[in-house]
Every structure is written in structure tokens, then in C-alpha cells.
Amino acid sequence: MAEASSLGRQSPRVVSCLEHSLCPGEPGLQTTAVVSMGSGDHQFNLAEILSQNYSVRGECEEASRCPDKPKEELEKDFISQSNDMPFDELLALYGYEASDPISDRESEGGDVAPNLPDMTLDKEQIAKDLLSGEEEEETQSSADDLTPSVTSHEASDLFPNRSGSRFLADEDREPGSSASSDTEEDSLPANKCKKEIMVGPQFQADLSNLHLNRHCEKIYENEDQLLWDPSVLPEREVEEFLYRAVKRRWHEMAGPQLPEGEAVKDSEQALYELVKCNFNVEEALRRLRFNVKVIRDGLCAWSEEECRNFEHGFRVHGKNFHLIQANKVRTRSVGECVEYYYLWKKSERYDYFAQQTRLGRRKYVPSGTTDADQDLDGSDPDGPGRPRPEQDTLTGMRTDPLSVDGTAGGLDEPGVASDGLPSSEPGPCSFQQLDESPAVPLSHRPPALADPASYQPAVTAPEPDASPRLAVDFALPKELPLISSHVDLSGDPEETVAPAQVALSVTEFGLIGIGDVNPFLAAHPTCPAPGLHSEPLSHCNVMTC
């Protein structure tokens, strides 16, 4: 309806133009009138207007018949008629073709859809289109009165055609580009898309030049060595040889060597020894007997004799496995002896061996402790490496008291007794006879221990029918300090000596039995007591039983 109103506003000029041109007496009846309709610049042909159903000439005749009517009334009548006229007829009156809007929309949609351009934005092309559009508008506005106008539908058809030409150019260009891309794809090799396995003579390298100079050379520098040939001896003889080698039956026995149903353990070293002996069984067994590195089995392979020899060699040589192998176990290597030693230490046989070894001797160390491994590292009693055991508790302890400055039996003269006679033992004083009174009382303590000068020794007689036996008791009274208050014969006490300045030496007498001690004590005189000794230094009680 907006178009209708605009046409209504433009209708007075059209009517006036038509009135002047169609009135009788006017010369230009069949001339063409150019009517300007605003900025649209539409051109109308008068013949087309007259060809419509509504006759404008009749209206003009009526207007001429009534010359009394003013122009204003005529214009009003035309406007009223145009207002009552349908929109399609009004368009036809002004030169527009009536068309179906639905069909137009379908046709436009169908035409534009296949001709859609590329949706990519080209800035240069857009700028050119805008500039050209502005220039065209300027030229058209300046030449509105000079150039004839065309109908709106013809003008509207120009833009799609121009854009359609551009679309067609794009369409013409797209198949070409697709064709070029197809040719490029066809030019690519097939290996790029699908990988092939390179197998065949055409993929192998030519190494003929490298083999020309090696025809006369050996492939290996060292010659091959034959380790075993199964086609020389029968299988039964080979099994008997292995059985004798494993069981260490070196001498040939009458009858079959291999029991029935006995499984034979394979030994590659024994078979190799047989090959080196040119398949001589006896010679191979003789070599195996003296070759200790051939057969290597576990602990169960050691015979009872080898185990006893190893234990005896361990007593003699300790952990010197080289001497054990050379002197005791010649059928074994040093490595096998070491391996057997560590397996033997974890067995019950070692516990029994250690228990029997500790019964006869104990090794004395400065710290006063006994190491079990050091006990077993010694040798047998006849060997030179055997350590000397400690003195027996019944015969090995000294019975003479200690003194700092010994007047009769000093520590600096180990081989001389108090009476000037030489002693056969290396001790500072010989043993006392059992029938002599001891220097220290047995059951009585001094009455006044605080005063050393008032100390007097007490003499007790031994029992006549008691068997001679020595018992030594080292016990210090808890209420007395550990000091030495040696009293001189004149009764004046000497200077006390601190415990750190007193050294206690124990003489080793070896293994001396009671029968050896009695004749020794009877043959030598006793060593009298050199003087008074303090009980706090060493409370030594000599008892006879």
C-alpha cells in the first residue's frame, strides 16, 4: 500500500500531463510524453497507457464536454478513481506488469540458488563494487532529465544478470580448478597412498664387489674344535663311562658297570675328556681321577672319606684351603673346597664338629672372649699351629702371693726360689708342699684390718689323711679398698701401691696332671712366706682336701 500512496502523490502531475496532451485541439495526440516520477526515473509510453482497459481518452472527452469544471475537480476525480482501483490495475495503469508474487519468489529463489557465489569475502572486490555503485548513482542523478528511464522490472533484471555473469564466471572457473586438482591427484604416485613391502631381488643390494676378494680367505680365523662325536662308541659304553665318572669308580670291575634301570647324569666335561683321549675309556677315567676341575657336583657328591679328610685338614691348616686341597683333598679343586666349606658351615655336621673341637681347647684372646671361628681355625694337637690351651684350674694357678718389691721371691727373678735354689719351673716361686702351713689363714680374718701393723698370720694344720689337691679362690672383701699394705719385718708400713700399678701374670704350665705335681712337690723344698701380705690385694685361700 505504500507504493499506492506514492503513486497517488505522483498522480497529479501525470494527470495534468495527460490532460494537456490528450485534450482535443492539442497537436501532440500521438506523441510520447515523458513523465518523471521522482528519483525512480521511470519512462512511460503513452501508447502503452492507452492500450489498457481503462480509457483515459473518454475521461478527457468528458472533461472537454464540461469545460466549466475546473482542473482541480478533475484531479480529485482521478485521485478518487485511482484510490478505488485495485493495486494490480493501478500498476498496469502506470506501466507495471502485474505478476504473481508467489511465482516470482519461487523463480527468484530457483534462479539465485544455483548462481550463489563463493561466500569468501574479497575485500578488494567489495571496495570496487561500492565505488562503482556510488559513481553510477552520481551519473544517474545528474542525467535524470537527459536519459530515458526504463521500467523497474527491467532495471531490477539488470543486477541479477550482472551478478549472474559474475556467478557464471565463478562457476566456469570452479570446474577448471577441480579439473586441475584432479590432474594433480592423478599425477601423485600410488606409493604415497599405499605402502608396499619391499621384497624381491629388485630391492636387494649388490654385494658382488665385496665377495671378490674373499674367495681365498677363511671365514673364521680360529679353527673349529670337535667336542663330541656320538658315532664312535655305542651308547651303552658311553653310559657306562659316564656312570663310572660320576660315581668315581676308576678301576674296571667284572660284569656290567651300569646297573639295570639306573639313570645316568650327563657330563659334558667328562665326554670332552673322552674325546681328547681318542675315546679311550680307561685313559679318560685316569685323567678324570687326577683332574679335579672336570666334575663339579654339589655337597652330596662329596664322599665320606673326602668329608673326613677336609675336616682333618681344616683342623690342621685352618682356612688355608690351598693347603687343604694340596695335602688332604686332592680330588677336589680349591674352589670346590671353598664352596664345600660354606655349605658345610650350614649343616649339622659342622655343629657336631665344632662341639667336639671346643671340648679339648679354648683359644685365649686379650679381651677375654672366645671366638668360635678362631677356635676352629687351629690345627690338630700334633700340628705346629695349635695354640697352647690355658692352665688347668686345678694345677695351673700360682699359689704364691704377689708383692710389689719381692724380697724373697721377686717377680724379676723367675727361676730362683727364696732360699737361693734354682727352680725347674719358670714361675716366680715353686709350689708349696701340702704338709706346710699356708701363709694366709683359711677361716680367720685379721682382727684389725684398718691397722696393717697389727696384722698377724695364723697357722692352721692340714688334715693328715686328705688327698692332695689345690684349690685357688680369688675373692676380695667388699668392705675393703683394693690397696697393697705390705709390712716390712721392722713393722713400718711401706708405701701403698695403686691397683693400676700392679700387674698380674699367670704362668702357663701346659697340661700337667695331678700325678705329675705330687713328685715335683716332694722333691723340692718349699718356698717360705716372704713376709706379710695384705688380704685386700688378693685374698688367696689354699685349701687341702
Curated annotation (Swiss-Prot):
List residues of the ELM2 domain: 195-292
Predominant localisation class: nucleus
Q: Name one GO molecular function term.
A: transcription corepressor activity
Q: Which residue numbers delimit the SANT domain? A: 297-349
CDD domains per UniProt: SANT_MTA3_like
List, in alphabetical order, the GO biological process terms annotated in this UniProt record. negative regulation of transcription by RNA polymerase II
Which residues fall in a compositionally biased region of kind Polar residues? 140-153
Q: What are the boundaries of the signal sequence? A: none
Could you tell me which residues carry Phosphoserine? Answer: 11
What keywords does the record list, in alphabetical order?
Answer: Nucleus, Phosphoprotein, Repressor, Transcription, Transcription regulation
Q: Which InterPro entries match?
A: ELM2_dom (IPR000949), Homeodomain-like_sf (IPR009057), MIER/MTA (IPR040138), SANT/Myb (IPR001005), SANT_dom (IPR017884)
Location of this chain's protein in the cell: Nucleus
Cellular component GO terms held in the UniProt record: cytoplasm; nucleoplasm; nucleus; protein-containing complex
Q: How does it assemble?
A: Part of a complex containing at least CDYL, MIER1, MIER2, HDAC1 and HDAC2.
| Record's protein name | Mesoderm induction early response protein 2
Name the gene for this chain.
MIER2
